[in-house]
Amino acid sequence: MNTNPFYFIIEEEVWKNNIMKQIKIFLLFLLLVVLGFSLYKINQINNELNSSQEIKEELIELVEIPETPSDEPSFQVDFEELKKINSDVIGWIVIEGTGINYPIVQGNNNSFYLNHSYDKKWNSLGSIFADYQSSNDFSDYNTFIYGHHTRNGSMFGELYKYMDVSFYKQNKTFYLYTPTGNFTAEIFSAYIDSTDSSSYNQSFNSITEFNDYINLVKEKSNYSTDVKIDVNKDKIITLYSCSHESNRKKNDRYFIHAVLRKLS
C-alpha cells in the first residue's frame, strides 16, 4: 500500500480531471443536440412558410382580380374549384393595406385548422378559419374568424395594424366573399383583451343581448368610429388572433369587430 501522501493527491487530481473531461464531453454533446434540433426547427418553419406561400399562390389563381381599381372590388372567387380542393372552404377574406388575402375554412372543431393548411396538410401556420359552431353562411349575430399572429406577417400577422387609429382611417373596411354573396365589412371596434373576456361571445338569446354586446365592444375599442349598426337586421364578424405586443400577457388577443354590408 502506497503511504506517500502525494500519491493520493495526484490520484484525486487525476480523478477530478477525468470527471471534468466527461462533463465537458456531455455538455458538448448536449450543445450539439440543441443546435441540431434548433436547425431542424428553423428548417421546418422555413419549409412550412414556403409551403403556405405556394398554396396561397395556387389558390389566388382561382381569384379573378379586376385590372382597374374601384370603390367596390369585384373579385371573382371560383368557389366551385376551391371546394374541389377542400370542401371546408366557406369564404375568402381580403384586407387591403395588409397581406391578408386568404380563403376561410370551417372544420368540425376549432383545433384542426390551427395547424393544418387549406389542403388539410400539417402546417404550424394553420389557416384562417371560422368557429365550428357558426353557420357557414355568416348569418349568425356574430361569427368569429381565427388566425395565427405570425412573426413574418402571414395569416393574421398584420391585424396589429388596426390598433393604430391612423391605419384604421386609411382602411376602415375589408371584404368578405362567400359562395352565396359578397360583403364589405365596416370595422367599428378594435382592441386587445384576454381569452376569458366577455367579448368572446357569439351566442345571444335576444336582440337586447346582442345590442348590449355591441355597446360593450364599442366601449372597449382603442378609438371611436361613426359606424351605425342596426341590431334588428345587421350581422357582425370578429377577427380574433393572439397578441404578441410588448408588455402584453400571453392570454391577450386582438379583437377586430366589423358589421357586414351586402354588396350589390
Regions found by a protein language model. Give the residues of each.
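Gram-positive cell-envelope targeting signals
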Residues: 1-63
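Solvent-exposed, non-transmembrane regions of membrane-associated and secreted proteins
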Residues: 35-264
